[in-house]
């Protein structure tokens, strides 16, 4: 029966010894964000009134990493089992709310599954998420009488007959706050592990005459936990396969779904084509008919209609208007902006720079802290010298400017419309419209000159 309010408890106190890492286990990433963040996001999407995070190992780093989330931090100083962890959070439970118990190392749990679990919880009883496994070794078994759930027996405490049961406990459950506090106060550690098992409350509820309703997830992988890096890598591939399938069904052409990673969210138009080994990070928007070549990384960027990003280009916190082309081997750093029809070629880097409509920087160029007008040609080897060792300065280039190869523009400097900058020029002062600028050293040709000969 659906209660009006619900709080979520996320257990995240484990050290993760088998990860062989100094990083708390739940902070290891899946699809570009910490495992526990996936669970927090699910809790928030469910509309949880409060999210209680039970922590132990690496608490300072957890708090720093998750500082943007509104969490109630609950310390479990000693890891004495799941029941003990819930006991630490129990003082924060309201009697008239539902309490949903989740795990920071079970990152793929689906909101749809949790919604069904919440809706299935009987009045005064417990909603329990279970799955059936061909090999349930190591998991707590679900015991039933006449089809009704009566309890959970941990593998180490189970009889030979009970170990034949294939239905196992996932650890995810929901119960009323007042009931849960009462059951938690009765837990003991009289078992093979010497721990306080949250699973013991199932038998308590049954003995009190309360109903326990079991719900199954849509996919077993939703309840898979992570104890080592191998398991984490497997969940990563499961997650990525699911995301690739959704994109393909929505009309995005992934040339090889097994070689595509989505580490954030992707909004897209029609007829988008993505080649192999492309990584999408953060929030990315691709317009209609966008083409992305192999090996590209796109992060927190907006790519307009009919743009083409050639292989091995990196685009971060950038914006491309319609019909722009970049790469191969181009790098757009935060603040880069290309207006309609602009082109950035191989080994060109932009940061905090705007390239106007139809303007081109074909190769071997750095454009930083710059405003570049329309129909500008930036020759190979051009550098905007924006940093004096202490401060950054801006370069402004007007429309229809031609910048010859191997030129340096020492900021702060403004280049007027229609200016031509001869190859090899170092520009240190502002230039008025339609002027020619050159600062080459005069060429000297020495006839009959011979190279020095090495002494043997």
Curated annotation (Swiss-Prot):
Pathway: Nucleotide-sugar biosynthesis; UDP-N-acetyl-alpha-D-glucosamine biosynthesis; N-acetyl-alpha-D-glucosamine 1-phosphate from alpha-D-glucosamine 6-phosphate (route II): step 2/2; Nucleotide-sugar biosynthesis; UDP-N-acetyl-alpha-D-glucosamine biosynthesis; UDP-N-acetyl-alpha-D-glucosamine from N-acetyl-alpha-D-glucosamine 1-phosphate: step 1/1; Bacterial outer membrane biogenesis; LPS lipid A biosynthesis
Co-factor binding details: Binds 1 Mg(2+) ion per subunit.
Binding positions for UDP-N-acetyl-alpha-D-glucosamine per the UniProt entry: 11-14, 25, 76, 81-82, 103-105, 140, 154, 169, 227, 333, 351, 366, 377
InterPro entries linked to this entry: Bifunctional_GlmU, GlmU-like, GlmU_C_LbH, Hexapep, Hexapep_transf_CS, MobA-like_NTP_Trfase, Nucleotide-diphossugar_trans, Trimer_LpxA-like_sf
Annotated spans, N-acetyltransferase: 251-456
Region of interest (Pyrophosphorylase), residue spans: 1-229
GO molecular function: glucosamine-1-phosphate N-acetyltransferase activity; magnesium ion binding; UDP-N-acetylglucosamine diphosphorylase activity
Record: residues binding acetyl-CoA: 380, 386-387, 405, 423, 440
Keyword Transmembrane helix: no
Named cofactor requirement(s): Mg(2+)
GO biological process, one term: regulation of cell shape
GO CC field: cytoplasm; membrane
Predominant place of localization: cytoplasm
Catalytic residues, chain numbering: 363 (proton acceptor)
Function in brief: Catalyzes the last two sequential reactions in the de novo biosynthetic pathway for UDP-N-acetylglucosamine (UDP-GlcNAc). The C-terminal domain catalyzes the transfer of acetyl group from acetyl coenzyme A to glucosamine-1-phosphate (GlcN-1-P) to produce N-acetylglucosamine-1-phosphate (GlcNAc-1-P), which is converted into UDP-GlcNAc by the transfer of uridine 5-monophosphate (from uridine 5-triphosphate), a reaction catalyzed by the N-terminal domain.
Subunit structure: Homotrimer.
Protein name per the record: Bifunctional protein GlmU
